[in-house]
């Protein structure tokens, strides 16, 4: 998509136009670094009016911003499906994302993140619609195409396929527990035809290319190589990095080397905790699962809910 957008522009001198900082690698991922934080040295060639490579970069940044707008619209309409009689909750949900510093940073950069975020939001909106409305072949096929495009934009899109398959399995419970073998069979062929097949058609060629070229269908081994190779970290060493991952959810800029003031992380972490408390209160309080024509507590159906919910947990 990005290549098609900037195809009319002359970017043949991109390597010469972009002046990389030869000492920039010293600041990558190091928030304590006081110098060499910029990976690119900025010159007057970037000044207005933009031309060539720099015009292409700004067009791609604008494209990322438009994808962010699409994501916000998707969040709003998803919330409207959940709370059709309320306008404040959808606006609040949209505002929480719109004012998230990391969201604004990602959607002002040239990256594949804005596209997969947009497609993931579109897929979640479709799943909510399928939960509330009839499960039709057209809707399932559209969901499969959306997930396929997400998987093509980034490997994390594959997780959407697992999530959607588990979600649709639980959706079958909503229609009742009678004749569950037939329901399971229906879920199986619908998932294969309308979800898995479009994903394979859209993203399968890339996975095959990665397998032939790298011996890894996800090409993850190449990212490991670029990061310095497998350092054989233990599980606890990996978990020790979770604080950095948590901060990156809210505000980590530059090349993972620019942090926001401490109060920013406290504020957004507090909002996340309040949200989790609200979810727990809802689950143990007044939550009921609509099964068939009845509204019942899900506790009575734990033996059926647990195996059907396993794909969601995975």
Model-derived regions, located:
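Short helix- or helix-capping micro-motifs
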Residues: 93-98, 125, 147, 151
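Membrane-interface alpha helices of multi-pass inner-membrane proteins
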Residues: 139-155, 160-165
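Membrane-interface transmembrane helices that cradle and orient dolichyl/undecaprenyl
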Residues: 80-83, 123-139, 150, 172-174, ...
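Membrane-lumen/periplasm interface segments of multi-pass, membrane-embedded glycan/lipid transferases
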Residues: 207, 211-282
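Short acidic/glycine- and proline-prone juxtamembrane loop motifs at membrane-interface regions
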Residues: 102-115
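Interfacial juxtamembrane loops and adjacent helix segments
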Residues: 1-63, 228-230, 255, 259
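Perimembrane helix-loop-helix junctions
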Residues: 160-199
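Transmembrane-helix signature of polytopic, membrane-embedded enzymes
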Residues: 26-28, 32-47, 75-99, 117-118
